[in-house]
Amino acid sequence: MTTEQTTMNITEIQELLPHRYPFLMVDRVTSFEKEKTLTAIKNVSVNEPQFTGHFPQLPVFPGVLILEAMAQATGLLAFKSFGAPSGNELYYFASVDKAKFRKPVVPGDQLVIEVEFLKERRGIASFNGVAKVDGVVVCSAELKCARREF
């Protein structure tokens, strides 16, 4: 009996996502189940470039980057569920609905990103996503991603 891998390290993540520093927002996948859910982490470091301007006197991780981390997690789940990208394919972040930011995320926090696959139609996949810090929801949203050739 073989056990299918349910985690991903940074090397495996970079094989699926085109993003690189400073825009790669997923450090590790701690679990996933194809066509169902994926849980990932993003370690928030004061050394990230966005903190030089957002905000120097009180560094806060931008909410739009939390959404980007969720979108990258949905791309990973989609590729693991429906096949790895060909050399000229990407998952584009297509839309976000019902985004709520509940608490600031600051350097030193570890974002735990949980995404749930809902459905796929004509190459557009729908997901629910939440991001947590210390078990507390800091952001939630509905996301859609489109698999397209470039």
From Swiss-Prot:
Keyword Ribosomal protein attributed: no
Entry GO CC: cytoplasm; membrane
Active site, renumbered: H54
Keyword Cytoplasm set for record: yes
Reaction(s) this enzyme catalyzes, per UniProt: a (3R)-hydroxyacyl-[ACP] = a (2E)-enoyl-[ACP] + H2O
Broadest EC class assigned to this enzyme: lyase
EC code: 4.2.1.59
Classification via HAMAP family: FabZ (MF_00406)
Name the UniProt record assigns to this protein: 3-hydroxyacyl-[acyl-carrier-protein] dehydratase FabZ
Source taxonomy: Bacteria, Pseudomonadati, Pseudomonadota, Gammaproteobacteria, Vibrionales
